[in-house]
Amino acid sequence: MNIYQKVAKNIKYYRKLKGLTQDDVAESTGYSPEYIRRIESPNVKKKGFTIEAVYIISLALNVDIAYLFDEPKQG
């Protein structure tokens, strides 16, 4: 699993933990729902998102950005 896949899994995990939809996160961040779906995709590629995007999403999820780079949680 590469770093992009780790971040993707963690964003999805914390989003669901907070009871948010991809549309909710998109609205909170100003990103399109399609962009959020692409970031959460298990097939996310290099340059699929920026550190700035991860930071903005971490604010929307109210999660420390470091947690999004940890080993993915189960769930």
Specify the residue positions occupied by each region the protein language model found.
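Short basic helix-loop element that most often maps to the first helix and adjoining turn
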Residues: 10-28
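Short C-terminal boundary/hinge segments that cap the last helix of small helical domains
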Residues: 62-75
